[in-house]
Amino acid sequence: MKTALRGAGRVLLVLVALFVLYQLWIFTLVLWWSHFNPSSTSFMELRLDELQAKRPDVELRHEWVPYDRISIHLKRAVITAEDDTFIDHDGFDWEGMQRALEKNQRKGRAVAGGSTISQQLAKNLFLSPSKSYFRKAQEALITVMIEAVWSKRRILEVYLNVVEWGNGIFGCEAAARRYFRVAASRLGPAEAARLAVMLPNPRRYEKQFGPRLAAHARRIRSRMVYATVP
């Protein structure tokens, strides 16, 4: 009995050590990426694997652009559409989560999310689209790391450069050129609002941008002038 307990204890210690090492590895990358741009993300690698399973020669559309070369209209539109308390929160919008929970309960299904830009970035950089309690806990921990190390300006810069905007399309520069044939720096208010409302489901809205989504884009355009941008 004692031998079995000692064995179980060793296994537990090994698991704890591996968990701690994994968190240290993530934190090291967070520190590194506070000064250097990530060349890829977990989401990018996942999508590339999916695309190459059908077409081995396919490549992602992605081009990094610095913060100052991203349209102010896109920054305002994305904050308005995805996280209107971005400047003020510490990574989590507790009131937004509560509103999303209440809306989902009324509808009887998941129709709204309460994830902030920081949480979405944590998921995009390190995790997968899968849903589990462990993944949500890991997302929260990475969000704390990012908010502790990066400025809001850096968070928004990385987010706009790595977020998915269509099938194989990542980052605002690739999205601007794909949908409007302009650089990200030249996006106007209407174009920025349209890109912003695609973010919840970009691969679907790339093909199905109907009247309801167009109306949502107009609402975002009317409100985004009030957004505070870092």
From Swiss-Prot:
Principal location listed in the UniProt entry: membrane
Top EC class of this enzyme: transferase
Reactions it catalyzes: [GlcNAc-(1->4)-Mur2Ac(oyl-L-Ala-gamma-D-Glu-L-Lys-D-Ala-D-Ala)](n)-di-trans,octa-cis-undecaprenyl diphosphate + beta-D-GlcNAc-(1->4)-Mur2Ac(oyl-L-Ala-gamma-D-Glu-L-Lys-D-Ala-D-Ala)-di-trans,octa-cis-undecaprenyl diphosphate = [GlcNAc-(1->4)-Mur2Ac(oyl-L-Ala-gamma-D-Glu-L-Lys-D-Ala-D-Ala)](n+1)-di-trans,octa-cis-undecaprenyl diphosphate + di-trans,octa-cis-undecaprenyl diphosphate + H(+)
EC number: 2.4.99.28
Domain of life: Bacteria
Intracellular or extracellular location(s): Cell inner membrane
Pathway the protein acts in: Cell wall biogenesis; peptidoglycan biosynthesis
Transmembrane parts of this sequence: 11-31
InterPro entries: Glyco_trans_51 (IPR001264), Lysozyme-like_dom_sf (IPR023346), PBP_transglycosylase (IPR036950), Pep_trsgly (IPR011812)
Family statement drawn from the similarity comment of this UniProt entry: Belongs to the glycosyltransferase 51 family.
PANTHER family: BIOSYNTHETIC PEPTIDOGLYCAN TRANSGLYCOSYLASE, MONOFUNCTIONAL BIOSYNTHETIC PEPTIDOGLYCAN TRANSGLYCOSYLASE
NCBIfam families: mono_pep_trsgly
Purpose: Peptidoglycan polymerase that catalyzes glycan chain elongation from lipid-linked precursors.
Name listed for the protein in its UniProt record: Biosynthetic peptidoglycan transglycosylase
Native organism: Aromatoleum aromaticum (strain DSM 19018 / LMG 30748 / EbN1) (Azoarcus sp. (strain EbN1))
Gene: mtgA
